[in-house]
Amino acid sequence: MEGLQPVRSLFTRFFQLEAASGLLLIAAAVLALIINNSPLSYLYGGLLDVPVAVQVGALNIAKPLLLWINDGLMALFFLLIGLEVKREVVDGHLSKPSQVILPATAAVGGMVVPALIYWFINRDNPAAVAGWAIPTATDIAFALGVLALLGKRVPVSLKLFLMTLAIIDDLGAIIVIALFYSGTLSSVSLLLAAACLLVLVAMNRLGVIKLGPYMIVGLILWVCVLKSGVHATLAGVALAFCIPLRTRNAESSPLLALEHALHPWVAYAILPIFAFANAGVSLAGMTVDSFTHPVPMGITVGLLLGKTVGVFGLTWVAVKLRLAALPAGAGWGQILGVAILCGIGFTMSLFVGSLAFAPGSSEYAGMDRMGILTGSFFAAVIGYAVTAMASRKTNVA
């Protein structure tokens, strides 16, 4: 389509960015672990507990720095996810039903099976069961970054399969957060949020293409959603769906412009900051029994085994029932490798974990992070090895 940046260039830039940011995410997580397990641990905890307040008239928002990161910065991350989902649905791979069936089926399996495994392991503990959604998430930056390390050894169709699967997985995570991880609701704030949403929709329908007005109303929407009891990050998704992809003269795309501007900030600043703030697990007093506790065990097994069985299993079923075909040029070994890579939950799992087990108010807050880091690490290493070996055999064949 004329006026819109070609899908191929967006796709190439996307993978280049995610591959580089994945290394930064790892560095941020490792740095957090080192600092929080050193004599400087008091600085780490103290920094995240620093109170930050914003007051405008009667409106007062006071939170520790950690919650500003999780509720504020991550709203921009979800804004970017929403922009990517809308672009793919309107003018990308999610706009063609035939191309959606396989990754959508795989994504469903990759959410249901890990959740069932976690529930089964923690079924006798109602408080621990609250973390059932933690192993259902996939970190799109890490998963695509690891796959990008294989370069041209994997077909583009396989990368598209993983990207589409991860986007659908993110959409599923958004729905889960909205339905299961919202607090006590405020009817007044919800009505104000609905009014903001109506204004955004009206602006879209009236052909407003300047991003400024959308950002201003979006900020007000975020405040209303924050005060409503619904998780504030969902305001980013709602705003994204109202940003126009196309304009009447087709000379520019507000959505693509915003996506282009946000991508480096999210990849190189927001996600690393989030990883640093949430990955600092204290290893003091940790033993083998700590890893075999039902919470970290459920998360680790859910990510590593559940994702693999769910994604690979339902992909196999869809292909055998002739509902869809394998990505062009990809073999079953590569599909298995990608299924394992989907077990890299990291940032998304950490985010869901912060909702299920709030830091400072839940005894499982550190345990969930331990399971996430363990499961994600082994999923990355094993997934890379399996995909690399399968790609070598495919190339030889």
Curated annotation (Swiss-Prot):
Subcellular localization, as worded in the UniProt entry: Cell inner membrane
GO molecular-function terms, A-Z: sodium:proton antiporter activity
Single GO biological process annotation from the record: regulation of pH
Designated name of the protein: Na(+)/H(+) antiporter NhaA 1
Assigned keywords, A-Z: Antiport, Cell inner membrane, Cell membrane, Ion transport, Membrane, Sodium, Sodium transport, Transmembrane, Transmembrane helix, Transport
Catalysed reaction, written as an equation: Na(+)(in) + 2 H(+)(out) = Na(+)(out) + 2 H(+)(in)
Organism whose genome encodes this protein: Pseudomonas putida (strain ATCC 700007 / DSM 6899 / JCM 31910 / BCRC 17059 / LMG 24140 / F1)
Main location group: membrane
Signal peptide bounds: none
Homology family: Belongs to the NhaA Na(+)/H(+) (TC 2.A.33) antiporter family.
The organism's place on the tree of life at top rank: Bacteria
GO cellular component, one term: plasma membrane
PANTHER family: NA(+)_H(+) ANTIPORTER NHAA, SODIUM ION/PROTON ANTIPORTER NHAA-RELATED
Annotated TM spans: 15-35, 42-62, 65-85, 101-121, 129-149, 160-180, 183-203, 219-241, 265-285, 299-319, 335-355, 370-390
UniProt keyword Transmembrane present: yes
Entries under InterPro entries matching the protein: Na/H_antiporter_dom_sf (IPR023171), NhaA (IPR004670)
Membrane topology (UniProt): Multi-pass membrane protein
Function comment: Na(+)/H(+) antiporter that extrudes sodium in exchange for external protons.
